[in-house]
């Protein structure tokens, strides 16, 4: 090999290495991404079973049913007629209650319309509404003035009196 061919081989090998690294990073991110949905979104476009998503909204009034052990079933609603039944096994945050803003993460069980959550997030203030949920309610025209009690913070911790008081429960 002459000098020109060696240089071409090194450049081609380097580009191949970079392409492989980019593909591996893209694959890793695609496996860990959980898209955010509200019940109205799921009514329009169902999600394939065993696809990991985040489901946000309000815990439906009168929907919390405690089962055997630490299993809890409740509905997540977005203020419209749409509601999604959620099943969670684990310890719920102390601040979890009906009418509270909640974000759950998990997937739909195959062959059912039940969302099986493995993470439940609830916020400290009864007037707090997660930013994603508040934005979606505004888009759908379901937002009521005074709901949420505050403007959605632009950055984590801004606009909250006690930003560290987020409750998280993970199985």
From Swiss-Prot:
GO terms for biological process: cytochrome complex assembly. The keyword NADP does not apply. GO terms for molecular function: heme binding; metal ion binding. Keywords: Cell inner membrane, Cell membrane, Cytochrome c-type biogenesis, Heme, Iron, Membrane, Metal-binding, Signal-anchor, Transmembrane, Transmembrane helix. It is found in: Cell inner membrane. Residues 1-7 are cytoplasmic. This is Cytochrome c-type biogenesis protein CcmE. It comes from Rhizobium leguminosarum bv. trifolii (strain WSM2304).
């Amino acid at each position: 090999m002459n000098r020109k061919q060696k240089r071409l081989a090194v450049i081609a090998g380097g580009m191949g290495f970079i392409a492989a690294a980019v593909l591996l990073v893209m694959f890793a991110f695609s496996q860990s991404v959980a898209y955010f949905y509200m019940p109205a979104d799921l009514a329009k476009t169902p999600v394939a079973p065993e696809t990991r998503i985040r489901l946000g909204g309000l815990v439906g009034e009168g929907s919390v049913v405690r089962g055997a052990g630490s299993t809890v079933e409740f509905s997540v609603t977005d203020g419209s007629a749409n509601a999604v039944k959620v099943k969670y096994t684990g310890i719920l945050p102390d601040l979890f209650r009906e009418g509270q803003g909640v974000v759950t993460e998990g997937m739909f069980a195959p062959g059912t319309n039940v969302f099986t959550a493995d993470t439940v997030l609830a916020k400290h203030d009864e007037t707090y509404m997660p930013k994603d949920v508040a934005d979606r309610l505004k888009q759908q025209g379901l937002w009521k003035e005074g709901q949420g009690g505050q403007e959605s913070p632009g950055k984590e911790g801004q606009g909250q009196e006690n930003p560290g008081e987020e409750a998280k429960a993970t199985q």
